[in-house]
Amino acid sequence: MQSLKHHFLLAMPHLDDPNFKGTLTYLCDHDENGTMGVIVNRPMELTLDALLEQLELDAAECPCREMPVHYGGPVHKDRGFILHRGSSLPWDSSLQVADDIALTTSMDMLKAIANGQGPEDFIVCLGCAAWQAGQLEDELKQNTWLTVEGDASILFEVHAEQRLSAAAGILGIDLNLMSREAGHS
């Protein structure tokens, strides 16, 4: 099995599940036990400032208080997942996804962000997307998703609403021109 860790999942136009319709998901882990990732193109109305306030963290030093928190997926919707650049991981609970991309789930990173000492580039998500062993592979066979290798510049330099089309551009396609009907060969 080829791992899809550090890949994007692009929802095909015919995917009508409201949790994933029109989404770009960044896969953080994929092995024989299952798959885990976060949706990176669904900003919520909740801002980082409001989230930090809910957690009783003073965000006075946080330079990106107005940054939106993202809907990361339908699993563990009450947990924070922070996707960020970096290979030096001083945080309590981090997973190195690629050379320069990691996922952290520990409160110490949110405290550092609130104090203006967090990573320069990051996306805060509430919830994640997860698939049981073999489930994503079945969905791929059903043409539910397209996959392409992940790209840090799309994650951290492209506006959230443009990330899906930017990832599709790597493949040379425009999802708006694709049929809503799934094809199988």
Swiss-Prot record:
Gene3D superfamilies assigned to the protein according to its UniProt record, in alphabetical order: VC0467-like (3.40.1740.10)
GO CC, alphabetical: cytosol
Family named by the database record: Belongs to the UPF0301 (AlgH) family.
Name used for this protein in its record: UPF0301 protein Csal_0058
